[in-house]
């Protein structure tokens, strides 16, 4: 293969854990093209489909997914291929968390069928058709023949995998046969051949796919290894007792532990590496394979190694992985403005192509790109010459294509429209951070009993999510937290003023949704629990700011207000709008759930390695919070001068050093404070189980989904 667009990477610069030994790694010379189109995809999704937040797909700090897995992508194709891959990631995540994934797949399938059969994609209420149309139109404008091949491959991939989301696999062999297709063998074939301008002769296609199987087995297994935690969490969220992942299948079939299953997965990946290297070496000696087939087979080697390097450091799978500074700047300030061409449009289908294969949709979108000097507004350098050449080459004779802007518009007094994009940016950021979505899961589980109609249930979920994320934004400001879920806290990116303003605006959004429930009692519940939440937070802040240690009773009263309030809010709203014949007061369960959750959080803050990655080491001590273990310690050692002076120093410096934290933890062990907290958690959990059992008996319905959530909270 002749390398024109990529650079060989020094093995000292990346980690493979021995999962692709013998295969070099290359990286595209212009990864900014991928970054722009991935972030553009996020913007389009928000405008046409719904909230997305700071989405974690193909981008990463050091190695972006497409730039390292298709390093020889033609520069004028890298962007749209990255956009298509990012769209597939987002859609895949929707499938993972949706109760009816087949419906989501059907909508995608119909869109591609319309484009291929009729040359146009009709509008759909899902909004995803607009993005499909955008992908198709850009690809067709570049290379109609290969674009159609790529889109057909994508369609075939959806048709082959979309009906098996509920399937359970009996053995590893059966699973891997399915997984090779599920990981996107046909989808990747379409992207790779389009990106590198490869055409596989029809008579070699079957042979080509057969030879490629070890490579796709390698990529499928690697995906299962790095995505295990993410996929397991999705299964729990949906109340499933199985997971479509090699690690789960290996555990089930062989009765082995999770660690043993992971090691088995690693060994299978290494075996697939050896198998494909052998297949490729043998293929090089064949005279019946065309140049393009060999180019495709060789390119798969770099897809394998690139997938390993990207997968092992991707924010998509690892919450402690980061974006690059350039990516963070673009996320915060928006994409750079494109080279200011006369018509200010991007890659559209040539006019002569419109009759046969033009993906038409009657809405449009303003594009973004570079400023006058090839720099973004925040000063980030971008390869202007390359982008300009790519743009000019594919803008000749192109017609305007846009997608509609669904941003909420507000009329100013002078009649001009104001939008909420800037106002919502901090909120969108925090909603995009990794989350277990416990409250949404709990709402779905509680609905086994309450049977709230879908439309009202969605409103209750939205109200809960909005208030929860707004409270996190304000909590981090008030506590001075620098990390949230392993990422920079919202105010460290957007500043205090913008974050507070955005968080306050969320109360307006939540209230608008309460009004849609169309009853005065819902408004009363909303104001009561919102009041409780603020009262609880005020008590917490007062004790911290004035170095006043509360009693145990005062602490639990604060938690009942602050954390229990949101749990009570959604259960009370569900009870109001329940269609169940059984009328039950759920407040005892929801209050106990809130208290248990906060106490558990206090404990994990001190002892959990995962929590350290998410929020920092012993963050509650750093913030001067009076958590349950600290309250017990102060009561157990009221005259300990070391402890008192550490707390006093915090009031002066507002900092607790690592050494000081370790001293406090040592005192907690010595005084039995951590043991006391564990025992308290056990007692609280017993009360939680009692309330749960009582509700099961009253409703006369077993709630396996809620029970699974409670077990997850206890054992996590």
Swiss-Prot record:
InterPro entries named among the record's database cross-references: Isoprenoid_synthase_dom_sf (IPR008949), Polyprenyl_synt (IPR000092), Polyprenyl_synt_CS (IPR033749)
Residues annotated to bind substrate: 92, 179-182, 223, 227-231, 316-317
Binding site for Mg(2+) 2: 92
Region (Terpene cyclase): 1-323
PROSITE patterns per UniProt: POLYPRENYL_SYNTHASE_1
Function: Bifunctional terpene synthase that converts dimethylallyl diphosphate (DMAPP) and isopentenyl diphosphate (IPP) into astellifadiene. The C-terminal prenyltransferase (PT) domain of EvAS catalyzes formation of geranylfarnesyl pyrophosphate (GFPP), whereas the N-terminal terpene cyclase (TC) domain catalyzes the cyclization of GFPP to astellifadiene.
Name assigned to this protein: Astellifadiene synthase
Domain commentary: The conserved DDXXD motifs as well as the NSE/DTE motif are important for the catalytic activity, presumably through binding to Mg(2+).
The keyword Signal is annotated on this UniProt entry: no
Cofactor(s), names only, from the UniProt record: Mg(2+)
CDD domains noted in UniProt: Trans_IPPS_HT
Family: In the N-terminal section; belongs to the terpene synthase family.
Record-listed E.C. numbers: 4.2.3.-, 2.5.1.29, 2.5.1.81
Binding site for Mg(2+) 3: 475, 479
Binding residue positions for isopentenyl diphosphate: 436, 439, 468, 485
The reaction(s) this protein catalyses: isopentenyl diphosphate + (2E,6E)-farnesyl diphosphate = (2E,6E,10E)-geranylgeranyl diphosphate + diphosphate; isopentenyl diphosphate + (2E,6E,10E)-geranylgeranyl diphosphate = (2E,6E,10E,14E)-geranylfarnesyl diphosphate + diphosphate; (2E,6E,10E,14E)-geranylfarnesyl diphosphate = astellifadiene + diphosphate
Binding site for Mg(2+) 1: 92
List of residues binding Mg(2+) 4: 475, 479
Keywords assigned: Isoprene biosynthesis, Lyase, Magnesium, Metal-binding, Multifunctional enzyme, Repeat, Transferase
Organism whose genome encodes this protein: Emericella variicolor
Motif (DDXXD 2) on chain: 475-479
Gene3D superfamilies for the chain: Farnesyl Diphosphate Synthase
Pathway note: Secondary metabolite biosynthesis; terpenoid biosynthesis
Annotated stretches, region: Prenyltransferase: 324-713
Signal peptide limits: none
Motif (NSE/DTE): 223-231
Primary gene name: EvAS
């Amino acid at each position: 293969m002749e390398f024109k667009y990529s650079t060989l990477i020094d093995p000292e610069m990346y980690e493979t854990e021995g999962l692709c030994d013998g295969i070099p790694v290359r990286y595209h010379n212009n990864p900014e093209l991928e970054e722009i189109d991935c972030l553009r995809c996020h913007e389009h999704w928000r405008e046409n489909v719904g909230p997305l937040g700071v989405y974690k797909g193909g981008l990463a700090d050091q190695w972006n997914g497409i730039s390292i897995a298709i390093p020889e992508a033609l520069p004028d194709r890298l962007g749209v291929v990255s956009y298509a891959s990012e769209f597939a990631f987002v859609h895949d995540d929707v499938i993972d968390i949706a109760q009816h994934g087949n419906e989501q797949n059907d909508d995608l399938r119909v869109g591609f069928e319309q484009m291929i059969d009729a040359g146009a994609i009709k509008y759909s209420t899902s909004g995803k058709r607009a993005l499909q149309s955008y992908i198709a139109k850009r690809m067709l404008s570049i290379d109609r023949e290969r674009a159609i091949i790529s889109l057909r491959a994508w369609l075939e991939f959806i048709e082959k995998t979309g009906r098996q989301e509920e399937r359970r696999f009996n053995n590893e062999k059966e699973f891997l046969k399915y997984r090779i297709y599920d990981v996107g063998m046909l989808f990747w074939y379409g992207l790779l051949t389009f990106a590198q301008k490869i055409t596989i002769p029809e008579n070699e296609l079957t042979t080509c796919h057969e030879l490629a199987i070890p490579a796709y087995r390698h990529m499928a297994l690697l995906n299962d290894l790095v995505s295990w935690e993410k996929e397991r969490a999705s299964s729990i969220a949906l109340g499933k007792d199985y997971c479509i992942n090699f690690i789960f299948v290996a555990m089930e079939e062989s009765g082995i532990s999770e660690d043993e299953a992971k090691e088995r997965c690693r060994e299978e990946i290494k075996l697939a590496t050896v198998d494909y290297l052998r297949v490729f070496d043998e293929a090089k000696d064949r005279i019946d394979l065309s140049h393009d087939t060999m180019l495709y087979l060789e390119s798969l080697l770099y897809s394998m190694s690139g997938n390993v390097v990207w997968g092992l450091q991707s924010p998509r799978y690892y919450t402690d992985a980061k974006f690059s500074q350039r990516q963070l700047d673009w996320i915060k300030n928006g994409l750079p403005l494109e080279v200011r061409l006369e018509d200010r449009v991007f890659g559209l289908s040539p006019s002569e192509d419109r009759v046969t294969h033009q993906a038409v949709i009657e809405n449009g979108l303003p594009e973004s790109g570079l400023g006058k000097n090839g720099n973004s507004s925040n000063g980030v350098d971008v390869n202007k010459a390359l982008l300009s050449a790519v743009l000019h080459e594919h803008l000749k004779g192109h017609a305007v294509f846009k997608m509609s802007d669904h941003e909420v518009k507000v009329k100013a007094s002078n009649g001009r429209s104001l939008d909420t994009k800037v106002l919502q940016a901090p909120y969108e950021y925090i909603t995009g951070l990794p989350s277990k979505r416990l409250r949404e899961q709990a709402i779905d589980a509680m609905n086994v009993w309450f049977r709230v109609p879908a439309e009202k249930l969605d409103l209750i979920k939205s109200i809960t999510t909005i208030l929860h994320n707004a409270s996190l934004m304000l909590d981090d400001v008030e506590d001075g937290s620098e990390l949230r879920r392993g990422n920079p806290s919202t105010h460290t990116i957007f500043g205090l003023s913008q974050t507070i303003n955005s968080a306050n605006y969320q109360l307006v959004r939540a209230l608008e949704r309460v009004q849609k429930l169309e009853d005065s009692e819902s408004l009363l519940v909303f104001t009561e629990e919102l009041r409780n939440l603020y009262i609880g937070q005020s008590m917490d802040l007062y004790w911290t700011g004035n170095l006043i240690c509360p009693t145990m009773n005062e602490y639990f009263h604060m938690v009942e207000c602050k954390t229990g309030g949101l749990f009570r809010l959604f259960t009370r709203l569900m009870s109001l709008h329940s269609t169940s014949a059984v009328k039950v007061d759920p407040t005892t369960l929801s209050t106990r759930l809130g208290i248990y959750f906060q106490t558990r959080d206090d404990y994990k803050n001190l002892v959990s390695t995962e929590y350290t990655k998410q929020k920092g080491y012993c963050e509650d001590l750093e913030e001067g919070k009076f958590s349950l273990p600290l309250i017990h310690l102060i009561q157990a050692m009221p005259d300990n001068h070391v402890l008192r002076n550490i707390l006093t120093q915090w009031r002066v410096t507002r900092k607790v050093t690592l050494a000081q934290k370790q001293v406090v933890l040592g005192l907690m062990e010595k005084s039995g404070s951590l043991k006391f907290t564990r025992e308290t958690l056990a007692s609280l959990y017993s009360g939680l189980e009692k309330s749960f059992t009582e509700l099961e008996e009253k409703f006369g319905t077993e709630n396996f989904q809620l029970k699974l959530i409670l077990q997850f909270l206890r054992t996590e």
